[in-house]
Amino acid sequence: PWNGPIGGVWLGYVDGEYVINPTVAQREKSEMLVTVAGTKQKIVMIEAAANEVKEDVMLEGLKFAHKTIIELCDFIEGIKAEIGKEKFTYEAHTVNQELWDDIKAIAYEKIQYALDTDDKNIRDERMGVVTDELIEKLEEKYPTIQEEIGEILYKTQKEIVRAWLYQGRRVDGRGLNEIRPLSAEVDLLPRVHGCGLFTRGQTQVLTVATLAPLAEMQRLDGIDQEESKRYMHHYNFPSYSVGETKPSRGPGRREIGHGALAERSLVPVLPSEEEFPYAIRTVSEVLSSNGSTSQGSVCGSTLALMAAGVPIKRPVAGISCGLITTDEGFTTMVDIQGLEDFYGEMDFKVAGTKIGITSIQVDIKNDGLPYEVIEEALRKTRDARCYIIDEVLLKAIPEVRDHLS
């Protein structure tokens, strides 16, 4: 029982023309390579690498790809009509409504107060106090409250945060288009080729750049041929960045995915091997996390590369956009923090220069995005990344160093 079907295609842009599922030769000449998935009505996933592509080119490309997605969905529905089976009936889990009503009566305003801060540690402490108080007051009436209270508090917090966001209010007091306090520094570590520290609210990322001979490029054994990668970006998310003490077991899917996103964000602005005959490795260490660490890694990588003397064409910055929808309409907000990502419906991450987009990654929790949401997200993230480049990155290091460290 699901809301499919879903179709997916690759989208290229070669010589000013959109290409569906480009060949290997076409991909080498393409200005962008986008993986797009969607239903017949909406887009559900976007993963893009682009060569400073304009927002309107990206948007029209998604619309072009959607035509083929609709054809694929029709094809799948034809198969379903011919051989498909009847869907299983599914009874959704429901919470204890009586307990939920009692929790709201006792603690709704206290939960609102707990959420109303820009410090996630204070928020967690306040919610811990509320939880203990509720268990103490209601445990006799509801013996199973310890098993049920987590889900009910989650639903209550989600209800409050979403209502606030739709009204234009954020838990940290920002406006919907306002970015958290920003800072950037270079040269914190004296014995590396280049490093940059980028801070956005309670999210902080330290990126270190290292240069080596081209012989040290990463070798990749592909299915059909051996390839090499000259620029490598590795993303580390240690447990201490979120106040935990878990041991490190090596990179997981999250670290691999965020590292790949930050890596392809910088590739379009790197100099050619002839201009700069070095292998380049950047490593981003997340020191503190409250949302958008992957985009913080993009900004940190720009700082580190410029400090190392790598002659990148232009600075690259990244920012995310969130979404809340109701029966009345939708609201988007830039630079979502962890709570807004958790309770919202979209994490629309876009990186690029002031000229155009270099990468996109979109995660959603609803049934898909209409084009008016995508268009607004592209516009808002463009304005935000231009602000970050001008007001933060270029003030920390106005231009690429003219010498290597």
For each predicted feature, which ranges?
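Mobile "lid/hinge" segments at catalytic clefts and subdomain interfaces of large enzymes
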Residues: 2-117, 305-402
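Glycine-rich, flexible beta-strand/loop modules in the N-terminal catalytic cores of phosphate-handling
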Residues: 40, 47, 188, 193-278, ...
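Conserved helix-loop functional segments at active or binding sites
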Residues: 188, 213, 238-243, 263-276, ...
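A short glycine/serine-rich beta->alpha loop
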Residues: 246-252, 284-292
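Generic, well-ordered alpha-helical scaffold segments in large soluble proteins
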Residues: 64, 68, 72-75, 79, ...
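Extended amphipathic alpha-helical scaffolds
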Residues: 3, 87-225, 404-405
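Glycine-rich and small/hydrophobic secondary-structure elements
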Residues: 1, 253-260, 264, 292, ...
